[in-house]
């Protein structure tokens, strides 16, 4: 399937219908290779692959083709350069407003028009690049490409774009949980019998652990047994308590770093641990920007929504990017209730500390108990609307976590 798709793309490239800095590598030099498909999403397909011997992630989306036709109708081909520059300027302002570095961003984007660096800008080059900017993730990656907190954007050919591959996602390491039902010992044809047996054992365990004294005595032994069974049946690395805290601190720094970029605050509307990854030097990076928006643009998206109740006022994940309905206007308010750092505190910190621990101890038990008051504290935070407010919130959260870390380590 991918061979047919790339053959069509290269035919379009050779006919001068699509362009991009990686088209030569894809179609002539054959230095881009596709490996395993990582996504079954019909609208957006993601592949493992290589580019000039470097391991990369390749992405393509069907929306690009529809947008490619739409861009054709609003470009002024008689005044190609000036009309496209005006479009870029308007588009950047719509996304980021009048940010301090927006003029530099506009100039940087315009330089991408000449994708083969031959000193000439063609209609195909402009049309291909402008279409790419209409896709949320490529636009955000290109804008933030100099940030150490985002995966590197290597280039594109038409609707195919190539980004840095990180060895591990955070969900693989810090989102790992294990239950008795995950254990698989019998062959596949005995799966039903195995499931019945596991359910029976689970019921017995629940009854036994309902007795307070027995629960206290056996809890540590069970946690230790789960650890050894898990290590025998899974390749997932299990982080220790120190690594969990360090990861949360890195998560805070990454969130603050991305929103402190000179283009203004950002908000992820599909925030989960699978959207973060580690490089070979353990640098945490955000790896998915499909639903990450500048706060100004997100506010506009919300205000454009007609509403009859608060349930109508959300973008992306309904539990993350939501506001409230203005009864007077029948439209949604532009202010998002919860910033990423609040979502991380309320949802993801409990997941991180709920995961498997190498040894069940008073230390880990103390940490898990201390997390619940922290989550309640996060729920009381005011709406974050400025970078300064975000910095103060991140500092406050780090202080609370360090207090938990220090007090529990003394046990």
Task: Show the residue positions of the predicted features.
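Conserved structural core of kinase catalytic domains
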Residues: 74, 83-130, 150-248
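ATP-binding glycine-rich phosphate-binding loop
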Residues: 1-112, 131-138, 144-148
């Amino acid at each position: 399937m991918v061979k047919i798709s790339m053959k069509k793309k290269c035919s379009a490239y050779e006919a001068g219908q699509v362009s991009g800095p990686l088209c030569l590598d894809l179609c002539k030099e054959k230095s881009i290779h596709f490996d395993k498909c990582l996504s079954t999403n019909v609208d957006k397909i993601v592949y493992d692959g290589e580019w000039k011997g470097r391991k990369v992630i390749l992405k393509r989306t069907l929306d690009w083709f529809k947008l490619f036709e739409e861009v054709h109708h609003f470009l002024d081909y008689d005044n190609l350069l000036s009309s496209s520059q005006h479009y870029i300027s308007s588009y950047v302002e719509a996304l980021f407003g009048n940010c301090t570095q927006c003029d530099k961003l506009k100039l940087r984007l315009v330089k991408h028009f000449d994708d083969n660096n031959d000193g000439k800008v063609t209609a195909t080059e402009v049309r291909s690049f402008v279409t790419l900017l209409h896709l949320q993730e490529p636009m955000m990656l290109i804008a933030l490409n100099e940030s150490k907190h985002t995966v590197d954007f290597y280039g594109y050919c038409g609707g195919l774009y190539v980004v840095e591959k990180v060895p591990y996602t955070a969900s693989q390491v810090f989102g790992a949980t294990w239950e008795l039902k995950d254990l698989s010992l019998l062959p596949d044809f005995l799966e039903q019998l195995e499931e019945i047996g596991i359910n029976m054992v689970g019921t017995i365990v629940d009854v036994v652990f309902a007795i307070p004294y027995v629960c206290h005595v056996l809890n540590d032994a069970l946690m230790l047994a789960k650890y050894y069974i898990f290590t025998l049946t899974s390749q997932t690395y299990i982080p220790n308590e120190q690594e969990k805290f360090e990861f949360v601190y890195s998560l805070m720094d990454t969130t603050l770093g991305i929103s402190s970029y000179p283009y203004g605050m950002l908000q992820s509307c599909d925030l989960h641990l699978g959207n973060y990854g580690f490089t070979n030097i353990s640098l945490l990076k955000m790896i998915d920007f499909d639903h990450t928006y500048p706060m100004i643009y997100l506010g506009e998206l919300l205000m454009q929504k007609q509403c009859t109740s608060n349930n109508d006022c959300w973008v992306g994940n309904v539990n993350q990017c939501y506001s409230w309905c203005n009864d007077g206007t029948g439209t949604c308010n532009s202010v998002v209730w919860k910033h990423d750092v609040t979502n991380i505190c309320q949802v993801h910190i409990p997941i991180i500390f709920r995961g498997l621990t190498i040894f069940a101890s008073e230390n880990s038990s103390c940490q898990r108990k201390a997390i619940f008051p922290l989550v309640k504290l996060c729920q009381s935070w005011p709406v974050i609307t400025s970078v300064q407010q975000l910095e103060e919130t991140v500092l406050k959260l780090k202080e609370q976590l360090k207090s938990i870390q220090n007090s529990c380590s003394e046990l």
